[in-house]
């Protein structure tokens, strides 16, 4: 079965010698509003559709097993060809498995976004689990994720169409799972979001979450 629909859909220019585009999801979204009558009933003739927009998610998979692959993207900066604005990027890693990168974005048919963006980056191992949480990489790490999300605000015109938007604050969230009965020490630049310790029928596992903030 052919999957040629992916060709030419690398909208954020992320595919290269290390990363292959393997999945794409595109959605057409619209909001609707309808008035209610005095008895709480809907009045169908009043229904209005507004704020049409398109969302997209692209997934890339590492096609090499090399360690410390660079992952970098400018969140909030629209692709000049497609018009899509990336608002989040997530790295998922586990053992066994090759790393995957997921990028989500959106665009509108009208209006303009302010050109304010922030560069985000991390490094991942092409194969196996990357430890994004620990001060020193823990060999017992079984899975790790890293997510960068830029806060995005859209405003509508008086008729309900998209009018203007801007991106601003950026948050980095990380998580990891470890073969251990204690959570590892966090990297110095991270703030602890909590941990869970679980006893299984074979090994203890520790799960850890943390975050930090970036300024555009």
Regions flagged by a language model, labelled:
Residues 1-3, 211-216:
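Viral virion structural and adsorption modules
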Residues 1-63, 77-106, 110-207:
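Solvent-exposed edge beta-strands and adjacent loop segments
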Residues 68-72:
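Extended intrinsically disordered, low-complexity coil regions enriched in Ser, Thr, Gly, Ala
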């Amino acid at each position: 079965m052919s999957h040629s629909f992916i060709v030419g859909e690398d909208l954020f220019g992320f595919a290269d010698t290390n990363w292959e585009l393997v999945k794409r999801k595109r959605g057409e979204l619209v909001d609707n509003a309808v008035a209610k009558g005095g008895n709480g009933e809907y009045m169908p003739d009043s229904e209005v559709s507004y704020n049409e927009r398109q969302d997209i998610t692209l997934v890339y998979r590492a096609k090499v097993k090399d360690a410390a692959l660079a992952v970098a993207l400018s969140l909030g900066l629209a692709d000049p060809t497609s018009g899509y604005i990336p608002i989040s990027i997530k790295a998922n890693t586990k053992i066994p498995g090759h790393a995957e990168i997921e990028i989500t974005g959106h665009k509108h048919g009208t209006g303009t976004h302010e050109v304010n963006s922030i560069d985000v980056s991390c490094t991942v191992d092409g194969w196996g689990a990357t430890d994004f949480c620990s001060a020193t990489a823990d060999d017992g790490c079984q899975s790790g994720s890293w997510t960068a999300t830029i806060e995005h605000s859209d405003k509508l015109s008086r008729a309900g169409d998209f009018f203007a938007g801007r991106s601003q604050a950026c948050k980095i969230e990380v998580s990891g799972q470890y073969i251990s009965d204690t959570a590892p020490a966090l990297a110095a630049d991270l703030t602890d979001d909590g941990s869970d310790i679980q006893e299984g029928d074979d090994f203890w596992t520790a799960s850890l979450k943390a975050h930090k903030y970036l300024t555009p």
